[in-house]
Amino acid sequence: MSLSTKDKETVKDLWGHISASADAIGADALGRLLVVYPQTKIYFLHWPDLSPNSPSVKNHGKNIMSGIALAVTKIDDLKSGLNALSEQHAFQLRVDPANFKLLSHCILVVLAIRFPHEFTPEAHVAMDKFFCGVSLALAEKYR
């Protein structure tokens, strides 16, 4: 699914609202992921606490949103812009790429809750397409 110029503008505009609370959004989304899709906990068994508000979840949520921030800056070429993250997730972390879509869904839910006025149907479509592109770019090295 390709992003139109309008989609890219919408993503960047919404990111302007998101960026101030990106760490908390990432933590909330990751916490949701671990509760709603408990099979994803397998990647984090080395953490002492997998509860939604644990320091480990908060820290990794921050890392996730740093990756999303990078993707926003590389929105015109997600594949090459996220190449290093794709390699890390494929070869080092060995994350099943299906989990990228699950996390994307959790992020969308958090955005809808936190930004009810800004998260219009048009913004929802643009962000969904953006996260599909991010998921595809992150899965690139799995092929």
Curated annotation (Swiss-Prot):
Heme b binds at H89. Signal peptide: none annotated. Red blood cells. GO terms for molecular function: haptoglobin binding; heme binding; iron ion binding; organic acid binding; oxygen binding; oxygen carrier activity; peroxidase activity. GO terms for cellular component: blood microparticle; haptoglobin-hemoglobin complex; hemoglobin complex. PROSITE patterns: GLOBIN (PS01033). InterPro entries: Globin, Globin-like_sf, Globin/Proto, Hemoglobin_a-typ, Hemoglobin_oxygen_transport, Hemoglobin_pi. Pfam families: Globin. This fish has two hemoglobins: Hb1 (major) and Hb2. Hb1 has low oxygen affinity, it displays a pronounced Bohr effect, which is enhanced by ATP, and a pronounced Root effect. This is Hemoglobin subunit alpha-1. It comes from Liparis tunicatus (Kelp snailfish). The gene is hba1.
